[in-house]
Each structure stands twice: as structure tokens, then as C-alpha cells.
């Protein structure tokens, strides 16, 4: 059953006394085209643990956070596991390790289960319909801000479906499966690619709904924040394997954005942002502070995103270093307007003084 939009007006804080321009959506689009008169636009995002499993509460938390800090654009940051929940993976919403709920049961427990991964209708699938509904609610309350929804790559989702990590060296809380990434991907290549194609088709349809106007049944968003998670990091996959298992499926989803905007994220150290310069994307985000990653002023031919190490925003983090990194980023500004943001999701909770330094950067 599709999740129906609800009202969140009574739960929201009032907007602060800001000097926001009348149409930040147009300003965001102009910056991604490279013709903005402003040198950068600023944002940050975090997980709202405890609010993520209800579309109204999640939308309320998202709107309140963005109103409180008056961000120039909004990355909607839903629970990190809704992608695999769409195909039946189960997580304990009351038992988190950090910002990720504990896995109770994976949808894929063996290679044969790949045959069960079929295309889904995002309008009726509970997990996807829930996030379309929450996105509509956020759009209703933030009509003048560019909104982009987080979408994981099909390869990342397939690994998540099997209870396998999508980051080098990571562990999945609650995972019990004994098969490996190679078992999943290489035992039956035909099944593997059929599953990846089904995920890509599902998320292409989902993305098309996210960017469609509300009066046409969509969520009215400006685009997506597309994350390949850590699948391009280090030697997790070499370039040839990445292109086989991720490339065509990434492009399928990205092309569904149409005229919308795509901010593309590749996570962790040695994350190879140069692999993605030929993708249909508008902005490229990587962690400039981790080893073997390029500096933010590297010219990749698209708008770049970055500015401060996300871990510094933890409560008790080094506020002096936040200020120093901001200063260094602004002093060595990229050659074209850019998006000023942390290098990844900021901690929950985050230090308000450090966030204020980011917000007030000029």
C-alpha cells in the first residue's frame, strides 16, 4: 500500500530571520551550470536517528534542521538502509550502531536468492513510497530551496541486500551470512547482472518520480545525491570490475534524472573521483582530506563539493581546525563556483559552534 502524504505544519519550527533570496532553487541550478554570481552555496546534513522510520517525523526533522541553519540547498538524508528494505531486508529500528540500524534478516542469503530481486513499483512499494511521501512533505515546507534526495548505486544496494559491506574494512551490524562479495557477484554472473538490472530499473523509476512535479504524482525535487558509497574506494573493486558491476547500472539511474541535477558522491580514501568525469552529473563530491584523494581545486570539468572534514563537526571536535580548513578551502577556491559542505555526513549530534562557522563562512 502506498504511503499517503500527511501534514507536518504543526510540528515545525518557524523559519528564522534570514536574508534568503527569493529563489534559491534557481541559484543552485545556476551554480551547477557554472554561471552563478556567488562563489559558493553552503549546506550540511546528518542522520536523524529516532525519527527515520516515520515519514512525517523524518520530514519534520529535516525541515527544522535546514530552517535552523538556513542552508542554501538541502540534501535529504534518509535512513541508510531503506534501499534494501524495499526488497525485504529487515532492520531493527530500535537498535542502531552509530547511524545505521542493526540488520535482522537479509533479503539475499545465498546466490540463489538473486533470482528474487525483481523490478519494483516505487509508487506502491512501502519503503520507496514512504520516501516519496516524506520528500513531498519537505518540498511543501521548503518551496524555495533546492532539494536533492539521497540514492545509493545499484551495486551498493545489492551488497546491502546480502548483508555485505559497501565500504572497505567495514562490518555490517547483525550480519550472519558466510558468503563473500566474490561469491555474490561471480558465482552466477547472469543472475548477478539480472539483479543489478532490476535494482537499476527500480531506482530509475523512483528517481523519475522524485523529480516529477507534485501535480503529476511526483515529489517535486530538484535532483538527487547519488552515492556509490565505498565501492570505488581503494582496491574494493578495480576499475574494470567497477565498470562491469556498477557503470551501466549507474548510468541507467542517472539518466532518469533528466533535466534535474545530480550531485555525485564517492566515499572514503582513494575514492577515484576521476572515474566519474564521463558520467551525466553536475557536481562531484569526495573527501579531500583522506589519503590518495585529490585537492578540492582539482578541475574535473564539473562543480566540486567539499570544504571541511565531516568528523570535525562531532561534539568535542576541534573548532579551531574547522576554522582553519574553511579558511584554506576558501583561500584555494576552485576555478568555478562550488558547493561548500562537509566531506560526508556530519555526526549525530553535531557541534553547533562548528556548524555556525560553516554557515557564516564568507
Regions inferred by a protein language model and the residue ranges of each:
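Active-site loop segments of alpha/beta catalytic cores
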Residues: 2-49, 61, 127-362
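Intrinsic-disorder/low-complexity, polar/charged segments
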Residues: 23, 54-55, 107-113, 318
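Glycine-rich, positively charged N-terminal anion/phosphate-binding segment
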Residues: 27-31, 58-62, 81-111
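A residue-identity detector for tryptophan
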Residues: 45, 69-73, 87, 96, ...
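Segments that shape or occlude catalytic/ligand-binding pockets
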Residues: 54-84
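Conserved strand-to-helix beginnings and helix N-cap segments that scaffold or border functional pockets
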Residues: 55-56, 83, 87-88, 319, ...
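Glycine-rich, proline-tolerant flexible connector loops at the mouths of alpha/beta enzymes
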Residues: 75-97, 112-123, 221-240, 343-345
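A gly/proline- and charged-residue-enriched helix-loop-helix capping module
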Residues: 97-141
Amino acid at each position: 500500500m502506498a504511503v499517503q502524504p500527511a501534514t507536518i505544519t504543526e510540528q515545525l519550527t518557524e523559519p528564522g530571520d534570514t536574508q534568503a533570496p527569493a529563489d534559491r532553487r534557481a541559484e543552485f541550478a545556476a551554480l551547477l551550470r557554472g554561471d552563478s554570481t556567488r562563489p559558493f552555496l553552503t549546506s550540511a546534513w546528518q542522520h536523524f536517528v529516532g525519527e527515520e522510520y516515520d515519514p512525517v517525523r523524518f520530514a519534520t526533522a529535516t525541515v527544522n534542521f535546514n530552517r535552523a541553519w538556513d542552508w542554501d540547498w538541502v540534501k535529504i538524508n534518509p535512513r541508510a538502509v531503506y534501499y534494501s528494505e524495499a526488497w525485504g531486508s529487515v532492520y531493527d529500528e530500535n537498535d542502531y550502531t552509530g547511524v545505521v540500524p542493526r540488520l535482522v534478516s537479509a533479503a539475499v542469503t545465498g546466490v540463489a536468492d538473486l533470482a528474487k530481486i525483481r523490478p519494483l513499483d516505487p509508487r506502491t512499494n512501502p519503503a520507496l513510497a514512504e520516501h516519496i511521501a516524506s520528500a513531498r512533505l519537505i518540498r511543501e515546507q521548503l518551496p524555495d530551496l533546492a532539494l536533492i534526495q539521497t540514492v545509493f548505486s545499484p551495486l551498493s544496494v545489492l551488497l546491502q541486500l546480502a548483508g555485505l559491506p559497501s565500504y572497505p574494512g567495514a562490518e555490517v551490524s547483525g550480519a550472519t551470512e558466510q558468503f563473500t562479495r566474490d561469491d555474490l557477484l561471480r558465482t552466477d554472473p547472469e543472475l548477478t547482472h539480472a539483479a543489478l538490472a532490476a535494482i537499476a530499473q527500480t531506482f530509475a523509476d523512483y528517481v523519475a518520480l522524485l523529480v516529477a512535479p507534485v501535480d503529476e504524482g511526483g515529489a517535486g525535487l530538484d535532483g538527487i545525491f547519488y552515492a556509490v558509497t565505498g565501492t570505488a574506494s581503494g582496491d574494493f573493486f578495480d576499475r574494470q570490475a567497477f565498470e562491469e558491476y556498477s557503470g551501466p547500472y549507474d548510468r541507467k539511474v542517472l539518466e532518469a534524472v533528466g533535466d534535474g541535477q545530480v550531485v555525485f558522491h564517492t566515499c572514503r580514501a582513494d575514492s577515484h573521483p576521476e572515474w566519474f568525469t564521463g558520467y551525466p552529473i553536475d557536481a562531484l563530491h569526495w573527501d579531500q582530506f583522506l589519503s590518495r584523494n585529490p585537492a578540492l581545486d582539482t578541475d574535473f570539468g564539473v562543480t566540486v563539493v567539499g570544504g571541511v572534514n565531516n568528523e570535525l563537526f562531532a561534539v568535542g571536535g576541534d573548532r579551531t581546525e574547522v576554522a582553519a580548513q574553511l579558511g584554506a578551502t576558501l583561500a584555494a577556491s576552485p576555478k568555478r563556483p562550488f558547493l561548500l559542505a562537509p566531506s560526508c555526513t556530519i555526526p549525530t549530534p553535531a557541534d553547533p559552534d562548528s556548524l555556525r562557522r560553516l554557515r557564516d563562512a564568507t
